[in-house]
Amino acid sequence: MARVLDAAEVAKHNTPESCWVILYGKVYDVTEFISSHPGGVKVILRLAGTDATEEYDPIHPPGTLEENLKPEALLGTVDPETLPKPDKQQSSPEEEEQGPPPMETLFNLDEIEQVATKQVSRKAWGYYYSAADDLISKNFNREIYRSILLRPRVFIDVGKCDLSTTILGHRVGLPIYISPAAMARLAHPAGEAGIAAACRGFGAMQMISNNASMSPEQIVENAAPDQVFGWQLYVQMERKKSEAMLARVEKLKAIKCVILTLDAPVPGKREDDMRTDNIGKKLPVSSAKVAEKEVETLPDGTPVPTDGGGGVGKQLFAGTAYDLTWKETLTWLTKVTKLPIILKGLQTHEDAYIASLYAPQVKGIILSNHGGRALDTAPPAVHTLLEIRKYCPEVFDKIEVLVDGGIRRGTDVVKALCLGARAVGIGRPALWGLGAGGIAGVERTLEILADETKTCMQLLGVEKISDLGPEYINSRIVEQQIYDGPSGLEKARAKL
């Protein structure tokens, strides 16, 4: 018979020497686990002795407990009658009645973000909105598209306009894909599976985050037969963990490729995320708040780090490898997976060129500065596209080039395609859509971008994606901003 514990008894175990938590009505002894927790020691200690379900559930996929805790860590269940009652915050009748407006009344992605900002928790907002340092790269990602002008042609029948294209040979309904974006359940319980449901109706590709809040099996469970997914890979210091996950996703037929992320070997300094590090913690048992100065070492003598938690983003990077190299990493990856490989996070023409030399092992690249979340003042994807066109245009013939960052209008989509991108990715907009209205919010996001992209192509005088090219844009202003030094290609070849 399962042991039933009083919440007051659980609350006593709030130290590194004896650390218990309540999850889904069950009591776990996590004392042995806290020193190896990927997100750091203090994340658990802040919740020690309390019901941590509300904090735990949105950011951990099913199976996490079973994978990391021994069976004997389960001590029993908690008597629900003994749990402290959370404080009820007073709210006005207007606030209680207020909810998201009908999604069809939102006409652009900015309006969707505004609605989502009011709906999601402060913690979710901090994680989604945040970017590195002064947000220069994040903002420039978007602003750069405004400096590119369109060159429409006339006397062309545009009654039929086809937005379909291919990514790695797979037919997709839109040249717009969902970039890997973590922790979708912070926005809405539907999570990444909700994004997948929205993509299904548009035939859009979804790249699943390595740090998704749902399991890959859950996310692709209701996929259409021809629906296309990719799996993002952050290589772990313990390579066996990455190999195990790759073996797992290879069993899912809907996942067509691996996206190896390279632009964030360490997390950037995301201050908005850091500020929310202690926000939203439901800690009704005051004794569970362990003072940092009181927690100096773990039972095994390991010092507890004294730096701040760093927010959700920093916690997710725990265990991520920072020792990747072209030869060793790609040799390893091609041995452990049969899935096509896309390299994500390239920010210079030199790296794009080197990647093309690894074809056919490397099938594609994503030009990205991680949404401005890694190195602030790193270039936007548009700059790198123009660099490739200037220094090594043969890259476009050898591998597929995708981009992400700053896409908020259909005109942005078209401009990127004109510069040679195969498709463009959206990350935050999908999360904001989910936060604004669940699946319907993501559908509305894709609908707006699809409609705007179609309208832009028709007004340009273009019937299909493959007809787009540099003759439809004027990028002279942006070209003045890009790197103008030596090509560096010979030096790049010498390193191979």
Swiss-Prot record:
Chain sites annotated for binding heme b: H37, H60, Y127
| Binding annotation for pyruvate | Y127, Y234, H370, R373
UniProt-listed InterPro entries: Aldolase_TIM (IPR013785), Cyt_B5-like_heme/steroid-bd (IPR001199), Cyt_B5-like_heme/steroid_sf (IPR036400), Cyt_B5_heme-BS (IPR018506), FMN-dep_DH (IPR000262), FMN_HAD (IPR037396), L-MDH/L-LDH_FMN-bd (IPR037458)
Q: What are the required cofactors?
A: FMN; heme b
Record localization: Mitochondrion intermembrane space
Q: Which UniProt keywords apply?
A: Flavoprotein, FMN, Heme, Iron, Metal-binding, Mitochondrion, Oxidoreductase
**For this protein, what is the EC number?**
1.1.2.3
**What is the cofactor note?**
Binds 1 heme b (iron(II)-protoporphyrin IX) group non-covalently per subunit.
Q: Does the keyword Coiled coil apply?
A: no
Q: GO CC annotations? A: mitochondrial intermembrane space
Catalytic reaction annotation: (S)-lactate + 2 Fe(III)-[cytochrome c] = 2 Fe(II)-[cytochrome c] + pyruvate + 2 H(+); a (2S)-2-hydroxycarboxylate + O2 = a 2-oxocarboxylate + H2O2; glycolate + O2 = glyoxylate + H2O2; (S)-lactate + O2 = pyruvate + H2O2
Q: Name one GO molecular function term.
A: metal ion binding
User: Where's the Cytochrome b5 heme-binding domain?
Assistant: 2-79
> Which segments carry the region annotation Disordered?
77-103, 290-310
Query: Where, by residue number, does FMN bind?
Result: 179-182, 209, 232, 261, 344, 404-408, 427-428
Q: What general EC class does the enzyme of this chain belong to?
A: oxidoreductase
Q: In the record, which residues are listed under signal peptide?
A: none
Q: Where is the FMN hydroxy acid dehydrogenase domain?
A: 101-478
What does the entry note on its domains? Consists of two discrete domains, an N-terminal cytochrome b domain and a C-terminal flavin-binding domain. The cytochrome b domain is required for efficient cytochrome c reduction.
Assigned protein family: In the N-terminal section; belongs to the cytochrome b5 family.
Its assembly, as annotated, is: Homotetramer.
Protein name from the UniProt record: L-lactate dehydrogenase (cytochrome)
What are the leading ranks of the lineage? Eukaryota, Fungi, Dikarya, Ascomycota, Pezizomycotina
